[in-house]
Amino acid sequence: MAPGSRLDLGDRVRVVDGGFGSTLEARGADLAAPLWSAQALLDAPDLVAAVHAAFFRAGADVAVTASYQVSVEGFRRAGRTATDAATALRRSVALARTAADEVRAEQGSDGLVAASVGPYGAVLADGSEYHGRYGRSAAELTAFHRERIVVLEDAGPDLLAVETMPTVAEALAVLDALDADGPPAWVSFMAVADGRTAGGDELAAVGPRVAAHPRVAAIGVNCTAEADVAAALEALAPTGLPLVACPNAGGEWDAVGRCWRYAGLGAVDEGVATRWVAQGARLVGGCCGVGPDDIAALAAALD
């Protein structure tokens, strides 16, 4: 895939993996620490690689790296160093690539690695990524994101997954951090009812502004209730870009207990997912609470 190129999906649907942090937790990782799933990059890299491999074996075409919550600022807040943060960022891509190569050798599959770029609120670990009101300027957000994007891109991912964006302001700040050349990116928002972002922006107005960036290859939603996905895709379809649909399994973040309280570890409904494809979704997967078994069922339904 040429640097700076748009991801040519055509009519092909690629299955994205599920909830990485929730799957790590289900396999014994302690996510109560301030660094959440990023802690496993330092303390349990073999487990990180194993989770990626499990999703690939289940039928995922794309692995999203465990870098969602990795940043210099976040690591310093947790008593770590900038060097630790850079190590974790590079390792997140390397471990996903190792898993892709391992499963390719077994099955002949051609898995892609998407480097996760999560919202600034994930660093604060207080749930503020669910509304995007950080008290930070656009320039400050761009500088924050640029610092880690440079390291991630140097590690050689196939894509960037700019995910769980609560507002258009932060999404545009991330895009301002991108150089002209680099891997294609998808941008996915956390959406709520009636085609709005979690921060209250109308996706119909947001879409064209994001899609205009030359490195944006797809646009959509993640970490969104299944019932709210269709309206979001309808709002974003006029961009003409391939759409992203990666809903969660339902639940709420417990900021005190520092864990998810799931309504149930349900699967992405395969029948609903085929309707999303009809709406233009070409990257379909899951988010929090969606595990490898769920992705296997989804992959079979979309095959």
Locate predicted features:
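Domain-level signal for soluble alpha/beta catalytic cores
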Residues: M1-D303
